């Protein structure tokens, strides 16, 4: 059996978007695979039928974007296939092309096209749709122009790319570029007429929450004096009447989600952020006579926070029906499905360890989910009466002739709090030998490590490293009190990480204490920066997409103007000392650890200036350091970056540790 190689991720199949047909007899799912030749990903649709438990491919071109069911026998999806339309887009025009494919056979045919950026489609019937459109108020309607007028407008647009003018905050977004003046709008679209009818438009930014019985439920975010508001409102649009109704005003609630349930009820997931700040877990309410009535008062960690570098794409995390809702939550270090009846009875379904990445319910009453089980890559599973069944084998071949390591799990205690930790032993582990080790720290901080596969960790274990990781305080899955470390970054979280390191070194004497490295991304990068300024116990560090200075991060990051103030409980004008005390840059003069910095030039979440500052400070103080910048990548480099860039990133980190932990 050969060892898992760094480049083996090119063979992985990533699954997402599980969606059942209107009659619940069959489901769509998307697969994505690395396209090394074009340095991208090929995305295709597959059909799953519960009756025979089989999947079959529906597309092969690898260009599928958004997709949905048109009816029980036809699907629609976005793709760019017409060469003439591609040329228009290349010249600067904005178009979306939607294709229709019959399940009975035949080629996909263009169903309609629009001179807009369509980011979401909800089907009302074969002719009418609810579209979510990305609109730029600063851009003229070039697509409606002709002749010289269009040519001049395109030429001006090209020339204007040399400049960027902003008058809003945030003015850019990670993975989106500059967002100034851009809004997400909701429109009705009639295919035969080719006309759009606005539901919610500029200056508001709106997203569809649910559509049912001729009504659109949607969430609206506003800008006040050029600043994006942190609270939002909930609206209901009656398609037949063409009327909007405000259901929840914008002055109190941060609304995370909403939908229809039961026969005629509306639920809202929301929080006022009063007690635990912006990361406070939402409560779920029923909206009755204009009042928010608690439906379930449990402290729920909504969705899956179980991290991995082996996913691409999302999917449904909540399912609603006449009996209530089912939804994904993070429980300690696993994500599982819950049910909630209209009477308010919540049940956490007993499931295997791992992650539920998205799910839907079939007509047979069975729950189907895409998830990770048994330290392996994603597959499709069914769940009924407490029993899970694996239904697909997209990634089985990956494990046929390569070695992977199942981590040891254990708990430890710090400050009276029980915490979770894992250790991967090196492949071909010999208890009589000494090995180097790598400590990997998760991002967030409100996420978790769990019993799921991480490609980078498996690579290192196959190269002869111990790899260890834990969930310190500040993470998800254990309620608001556990997650709330506002104003105390680098305190109990750092204490937990150092205690875990002590425990690991004691439990595994085969680890060479002089050859231990530390790495992490985002919050994990922040903690890496923090650690090297507070201890010399690590022989090397790799800080990825990090934060080094809360003062600069606060007013450069796309979320900084509210995230920094909330998380470090200060601003430069209210308590500069507290902000600086929690900034790793303050302690850069104490660093002795050779450190690699990994950063993307389009990372607007933890901007590249954060990496520049820490790198420059270490160089100034004579510490061995290296900065590798990735052009055209953003905060998602390790999980969704271009394949060749993902390979180079892991090469850089691995080579750094090889240099300092082995040589």
Regions found by a protein language model. Name each.
Residues 19-26, 66-74, 121-127, 209-215, ...:
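Blade-terminus and WD-like Trp-Asp/Gly-His loop motifs, strongest in beta-propeller folds
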């Amino acid at each position: 059996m050969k060892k898992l190689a760094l480049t083996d991720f090119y063979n992985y199949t990533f699954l997402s978007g599980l969606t059942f047909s209107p009659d619940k007899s069959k489901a769509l799912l998307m697969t994505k695979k690395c396209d090394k030749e074009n340095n991208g990903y090929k995305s295709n649709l597959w059909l799953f039928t519960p009756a025979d438990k089989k999947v079959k491919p529906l597309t092969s071109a690898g260009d599928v974007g958004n997709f949905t069911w048109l009816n029980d026998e036809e699907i629609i999806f976005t793709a760019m296939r017409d060469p003439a339309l591609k040329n228009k887009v290349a010249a600067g025009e904005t178009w979306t092309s939607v294709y229709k494919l019959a399940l009975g056979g035949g080629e996909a045919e263009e169903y309609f096209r629009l001179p807009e950026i369509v980011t979401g489609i909800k089907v009302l019937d074969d002719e009418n749709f609810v579209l979510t459109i990305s609109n730029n108020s600063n851009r003229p309607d070039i697509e409606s122009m002709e002749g010289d007028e269009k040519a001049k407008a395109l030429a001006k647009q090209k020339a204007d790319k040399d400049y960027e003018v902003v008058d809003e905050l945030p003015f850019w977004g990670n993975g989106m570029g500059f967002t100034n003046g851009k809004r997400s709008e909701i429109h009705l679209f009639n295919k035969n007429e080719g006309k759009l009818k606005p539901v919610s438009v500029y200056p508001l930014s709106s997203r569809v929450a649910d559509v049912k019985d001729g009504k659109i439920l949607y969430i609206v975010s506003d800008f006040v004096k050029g600043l994006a508001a942190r609270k939002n409102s909930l609206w209901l649009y009656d398609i037949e009447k063409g009327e909007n109704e405000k259901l929840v005003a914008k002055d109190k609630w941060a609304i995370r989600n909403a939908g229809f349930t039961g026969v005629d009820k509306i639920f809202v997931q929301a929080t006022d952020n009063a007690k635990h700040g912006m990361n406070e877990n939402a409560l779920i309410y029923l909206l009755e006579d204009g009042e928010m009535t608690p439906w379930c008062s449990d402290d729920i960690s909504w969705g899956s926070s179980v991290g991995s570098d082996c996913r691409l794409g999302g999917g449904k995390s909540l399912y609603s029906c006449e009996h209530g809702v089912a939804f994904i939550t993070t429980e300690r270090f696993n994500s599982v499905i819950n049910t909630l009846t209209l009477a308010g009875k919540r049940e956490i379904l007993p499931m295997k360890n791992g992650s539920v990445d998205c799910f839907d319910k079939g007509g047979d009453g069975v729950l189907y989910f895409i998830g990770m089980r048994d330290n392996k890559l994603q597959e499709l599973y069914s769940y009924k009466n407490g029993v899970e069944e694996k239904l697909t084998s997209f990634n089985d071949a990956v494990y046929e002739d390569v070695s992977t390591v199942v981590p040891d799990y254990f708990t430890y205690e710090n400050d009276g709090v029980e915490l979770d930790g894992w250790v991967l032993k090196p492949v071909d582990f010999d208890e009589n030998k000494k090995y180097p080790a790598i400590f990997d720290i998760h991002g967030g901080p409100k996420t978790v490590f769990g019993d799921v596969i991480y490609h980078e960790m498996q690579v290192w274990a196959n190269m002869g490293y111990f790899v260890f990781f834990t969930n310190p305080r500040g993470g998800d899955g254990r309620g608001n009190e556990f997650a709330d470390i506002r104003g105390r970054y680098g305190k109990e979280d750092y204490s937990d990480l150092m205690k875990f390191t002590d425990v690991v070194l004691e439990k595994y004497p085969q680890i060479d204490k002089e050859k231990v490295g530390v790495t992490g991304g985002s919050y994990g990068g922040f903690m890496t920066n923090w650690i090297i300024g507070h201890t010399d116990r690590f022989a090397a560090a790799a800080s990825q997409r990090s934060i080094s200075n809360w003062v600069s991060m606060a007013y450069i990051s796309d979320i900084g103007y509210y995230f920094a103030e909330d998380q470090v409980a200060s601003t430069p004008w209210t308590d500069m000392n507290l902000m600086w005390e929690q900034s790793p840059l303050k302690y850069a003069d104490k660093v002795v650890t050779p450190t690699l910095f990994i950063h993307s030039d389009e990372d607007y979440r933890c901007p590249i200036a954060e990496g520049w500052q820490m790198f420059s400070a270490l160089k100034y103080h004579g510490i061995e350091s290296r900065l590798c910048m990735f052009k055209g990548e953003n905060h998602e480099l390790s999980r969704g970056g271009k394949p060749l860039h993902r390979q180079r990133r892991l090469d850089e980190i691995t080579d750094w540790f090889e240099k300092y932990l082995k040589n």
